């Protein structure tokens, strides 16, 4: 054993700054320690020397120079490499953080600054009652995000005060928290699937939760639309390079908030990062559906995603409808008994969860192999050729499509047969001009083959489009989701069809609407207010009978049908190239896009990726595909780890299944996104 003299010679003084919540200023505490003292022993000495009776269980040591937490309390100071010159801070692991939600509402809640962001987001989503937290993450707003708003504030003499939803007593504050909001893994419905209000049987849960009735209303219902002036003051990306800037601030999911320089009471954006939405269910996901709707709405209004004027009016009509229903839903009494029988609701929920399909069609699905056969027009783009469609006889069976010169030759060899498994299916529709097209991008070794199909009418288009979409996922028309998919497509086409609208019930003059609030500023400038209101009201007749939650889901589906949906852009420089390009990352592919023209150059499917990693020395993302195809690029608009995490994150999400319930393999996520060989 060491004598006291030996200990003194082997020990040294360590200064620890204590971040005491009850005092305004931090205080330094000097301890005498040795290198073989474990971190837990240091914390014990600190608490004894501070001599204040309180719960210190949430406190931990933060090493300022190394920018890391000392969370392994059994490790010694020597093992961590802590010496006398180390600047340590004894501080709570949970701190207040301000989050701006997709609906632009600001919430303030207590979050772990020591847990990795993946875990912190999971806890945040439990507090806010958002399932499938793996689809979301935290984003630092880019410098241009508040640019226009600040410019306007300079001319405003009165300070702007914002109504912040304070959830300081949120369950993320401790591991042994009380009721986790309305978050539930049971099969008990917790929301009315029609209007999104909390089911009466769950209202008692609110007594222990920061999510009161009013707070739930703020999160689950759409907020009143912004004025056209406020909308015009928001940042709107004008190019792919501008859109790339918006995605530069995603936090590293494998590191903590503190490690990434986030300060207490700092401001971040909570957003859906991955455009792969799993198991959306109105009975559990009122908040999730609303926030997803809001993110889609702002993407349309701020032109973060392109759409036609016809589509913009459909989105405007749905927004107007949702806004009206939200105002009426918020005035309802949440505690009223549901008129829906519980058994009927459970069966209805099962039908929604199983994504359509009836039990009596099961035998038919097994024994029949459905087939589509009809005349369609085909066009294959080639350089220096005009876009000319030629008619062929097409046959669709299993996941393959074949075409013949005419119907009589169907029993012979086709001109070409293509397997659509893994292909990209893009709608190419203009209802007003009666054009119903399908764009197919079929994967080949060095990219994609492009072809266009043209249908004659809505029903034909819906059947073939649904078949192509299922085939791209490896499913056939025998799948129970085929029929619902056809109906969804037809429903969306009817929303676009102005001729199907009934006679307008009220004139624009009598409408309680500011039409400029529901379209992008650029679209608003093209039309007079009365003209715009009349067109929105005309489109509204096609959706006027929709319940609130269904209208939001229709909006999300329409958003998903846009050609650019799900693409996240980054400015990159490919290895061997002398110019910058745009890299588009989607749920199933990478796209190299010409930064000047916006034209796709090459597409790589995730299914063809063999491995990918980050070369930290050169800061390059290196990807190996099948058939010995390699590509490497340096990220110019963001850290290379962000793009690497996107690729691994989407591959991780593709492993989810309903058999897993809501348990996630967090280790697999970090293995796929960590950026190591």
Curated annotation (Swiss-Prot):
Looking up Pfam families in the UniProt record yields: FERM_M, Kindlin_2_N, PH
Domain PH residue range list: 337-433
Gene3D superfamilies cross-referenced by the UniProt entry: Phosphatidylinositol 3-kinase Catalytic Subunit, Chain A, domain 1, Pleckstrin-homology domain (PH domain)/Phosphotyrosine-binding domain (PTB)
Task: Give the chief site where it resides.
Answer: cytoplasm
Q: Which GO terms describe its cellular component?
A: cell junction; cytoskeleton; cytosol; focal adhesion; ruffle membrane
Look up and give the membrane topology term: Peripheral membrane protein
| UniProt KW keywords | Cell adhesion, Cell junction, Cell membrane, Cell projection, Cytoplasm, Cytoskeleton, Membrane, Phosphoprotein
Q: Which residues carry this modification: Phosphoserine?
A: 170, 179, 361
Q: Does the keyword Transit peptide apply?
A: no
Q: Which GO terms describe its biological process?
A: cell adhesion; cell-matrix adhesion; establishment of epithelial cell polarity; integrin-mediated signaling pathway; keratinocyte migration; keratinocyte proliferation
Q: List the disulfide bonds.
A: none
The record's section on CDD domains has: FERM_B-lobe (cd14473), FERM_C_fermitin (cd13205), FERM_F0_KIND1 (cd17180), PH_fermitin (cd01237)
| GO MF annotations in UniProt | integrin binding
Residues of the FERM domain: 96-653
Kinase as a keyword of this entry, yes or no, is no
Q: Where in or outside the cell?
A: Cytoplasm, Cytoskeleton; Cell junction, Focal adhesion; Cell projection, Ruffle membrane
Q: Which PANTHER family match?
A: FERMITIN 2-RELATED, FERMITIN FAMILY HOMOLOG 1
**What is the annotated quaternary arrangement, including any partners?**
Interacts with the cytoplasmic domain of integrins ITGB1 and ITGB3.
Domain text from the record?
The FERM domain is not correctly detected by PROSITE or Pfam techniques because it contains the insertion of a PH domain. The FERM domain contains the subdomains F1, F2 and F3. It is preceded by a F0 domain with a ubiquitin-like fold. The F0 domain is required for integrin activation and for localization at focal adhesions.
* UniProt function note: Involved in cell adhesion. Contributes to integrin activation. When coexpressed with talin, potentiates activation of ITGA2B. Required for normal keratinocyte proliferation. Required for normal polarization of basal keratinocytes in skin, and for normal cell shape. Required for normal adhesion of keratinocytes to fibronectin and laminin, and for normal keratinocyte migration to wound sites.
Q: Which family does it belong to?
A: Belongs to the kindlin family.
Question: What name does this protein carry?
Answer: Fermitin family homolog 1
